[in-house]
């Protein structure tokens, strides 16, 4: 199935943010910050994998992903969709079905030997591959999958994250010659929280302070204040 309707970008971002709140996939807690795997302290947390459990929301989000790619990348720019183990795999399958394309998945670690040791599925040499993840912060995990696809002979010029933290910019993607596509960010989630008055003003102000200066906020709240991006 090929998606051929193209909703406004701002509307898609707002709707995805509302969906994430509706299914309780996002959380704000400035008083007891979350500890991220990077060592950062954060007043925000998200679990995009919950999208998979809600068919109507899941279908709409994948329609938005297809629309974003067809409009911003083109209709004939990809030969294959790749999902990273594990969260990216179901979304890769859903997007590949939407776009009528083959799908592969990329292991975190090689299985066996050879240049295709991280690739599961059929990827001919020179295939133009789109890598999808449920979310990305600065691109570190996505580039592990991108590098594996490139090492196996694939061409990766584009990646898509359904949710982009958008707190560290896109320098990693610029340096890696990959265009990042995304649907929603923390700014969209915060805007919905404000509009619907989901939290008190102090909590919302703390979240905004984190988004404006994440490492400084982390350092003040028991987390690391420096990261290697």
Curated annotation (Swiss-Prot):
Q: Tell me one Pfam family matched here.
A: Pribosyltran
Biological or metabolic pathway of the protein:
Pyrimidine metabolism; UMP biosynthesis via de novo pathway; UMP from orotate: step 1/2
Q: Does the keyword Translocase apply?
A: no
Q: Which cofactors, by name?
A: Mg(2+)
Annotated GO molecular function terms are: magnesium ion binding; orotate phosphoribosyltransferase activity
Where orotate binds, per the record, is at 137
* CDD domains reported in the protein's UniProt record: PRTases_typeI
- Identify the residues that bind 5-phospho-alpha-D-ribose 1-diphosphate: 107-108, 111, 113, 133-141
- Reactions catalysed according to its record: orotidine 5'-phosphate + diphosphate = orotate + 5-phospho-alpha-D-ribose 1-diphosphate
Record EC number: 2.4.2.10
Any one Gene Ontology BP term: 'de novo' UMP biosynthetic process
Its domain of life reads Bacteria
Which keywords has UniProt assigned to this entry?
Answer: Glycosyltransferase, Magnesium, Pyrimidine biosynthesis, Transferase
What does the record give as the function of this protein? Catalyzes the transfer of a ribosyl phosphate group from 5-phosphoribose 1-diphosphate to orotate, leading to the formation of orotidine monophosphate (OMP).
How the protein assembles, per its UniProt entry?
A: Homodimer.
Family named by the database record: Belongs to the purine/pyrimidine phosphoribosyltransferase family. PyrE subfamily.
> What NCBIfam families is this protein classified in?
PRK00455.1-3, pyrE
Instruction: Report the protein name in the record.
Output: Orotate phosphoribosyltransferase
Q: What's the source species for this entry?
A: Rhizobium etli (strain ATCC 51251 / DSM 11541 / JCM 21823 / NBRC 15573 / CFN 42)
Q: What is the lineage of its organism?
A: Bacteria, Pseudomonadati, Pseudomonadota, Alphaproteobacteria, Hyphomicrobiales
Which gene underlies this protein?
pyrE
